[in-house]
A protein has these predicted regions:
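Short beta-strand scaffold segments in enzyme catalytic cores
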Residues: 85-87
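Beta-lactam-recognizing serine transpeptidase/beta-lactamase-like catalytic domain environment
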Residues: 34-44, 89-133, 138-298
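Flexible glycine-/small-residue-rich
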Residues: 1, 59, 89
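Conserved, well-ordered alpha-helix/loop/beta-strand core segments that scaffold catalytic motifs
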Residues: 40-83
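Small/polar-residue-rich segments within soluble enzyme cores
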Residues: 1-52
Length: 298
């Protein structure tokens, strides 16, 4: 972020938390003589200034630098238009690194960066996308947590499956194949994933998505966070359940997706993502404060 010449937050963290960081001006009224000297005992209004809060960001500078460098290299190697990355501490959900290739560096030439197409926004929280197969982890977690399968259970997975009048196939042609639950997700099988989702049922799967925070902002201390998109259960059409378990028909931000994996890595405890310590910050650590039990938690 950046502050203006008068010390007000202009964008980024400094803008979102301007009232926290700025403090409150003080004031004092006192009579003075004709030559400008203060007259003792004439103070009528004396309110001391209040300092702004001391805040320490959770970012690891070395890791942030490394991630930014790797991000730029990956973008160049792949020919992508943009790239972004988020690294969370699995136990606390503290943001250890958050990098984008298209955000303005507040310490650089702002005008030049704008001409290059860079933006003031932070795409890791403001640019939702359809996650696709990376969101199949939600189906996997829900199926195992609810006892409809186990990691080593063997399934006969056909090459396609009929869902609400439509036919969904895997990315590769195959006849009936034997896959364990682990193998279904290792191969990223659409068909196998939908088979397990059907065992969960639509209502349970909707609760699962909601519990993992899909369609809900994380509440991170940064401006312009998007909620993403999750169709309301009452608005589901016939094909909705053929899409959601394989990461289609919904959108998430990169931070939301990272948070889903954080919850799983933390044994099912979802800690709200934190960007700074201090000013009331508390460690979640997978405990009950600020944590929700997943799948299907609050």
């Amino acid at each position: 972020g950046k502050i203006s010449q008068d010390g007000q937050g202009q964008f980024g963290f400094e803008s979102a938390n301007d009232s926290l960081l700025s403090g409150i001006n003080g004031r004092k009224s006192i009579e003075v003589s004709t030559d400008g000297q203060a007259i003792p005992g004439t103070v009528t209004d004396d309110v001391p200034a209040t300092n702004g809060a001391n805040v320490t960001l959770t970012l690891d500078l070395d890791l942030q630098t490394y991630v930014q460098q790797q991000l730029e290299q990956a973008k160049a190697n792949s020919g992508a238009k943009s790239a972004s990355a988020v690294v969370l501490d699995a136990k606390t959900a503290q943001v250890m690194a958050m990098a984008t290739s298209d955000s303005i560096d507040p310490m650089g030439d702002i005008k030049k960066q704008l001409e290059q197409g860079k933006e003031f926004g932070n795409s890791t929280i403001s640019a939702p996308f359809e996650p696709g197969s990376v969101a199949k982890i939600i189906t996997a977690a829900g199926a195992i947590e609810n006892g409809v399968t186990s990691p080593d259970e063997v399934h006969t997975v056909p090459g396609s499956i009929d869902m609400a009048g439509g036919n969904v196939k895997d990315a590769w042609d195959h006849g009936p194949a034997q896959y364990t639950t682990t193998g279904i997700f290792g191969k990223s099988s659409n068909v196998g994933t939908l088979m397990l989702a059907e065992k969960l049922g639509e209502d349970k799967f909707d609760q699962l998505l909601t519990g993992f925070g899909v369609g809900r902002a994380t509440g991170i201390e940064l401006p312009s966070e998007s909620e993403g998109l999750l169709p309301q259960r009452a608005q589901w059409s016939g094909g909705t359940f053929a899409n959601l378990p394989i990461g289609q028909g919904m959108s998430v931000t990169l931070l939301q997706m990272a948070g889903i994996y954080q919850a799983i890595a933390n044994g099912g405890a979802d800690c709200a993502a934190d960007y700074f310590r201090g000013a009331g910050w508390s460690w979640c650590g997978g405990g009950p404060a600020g944590a929700g039990a997943h799948p299907g938690g609050e």
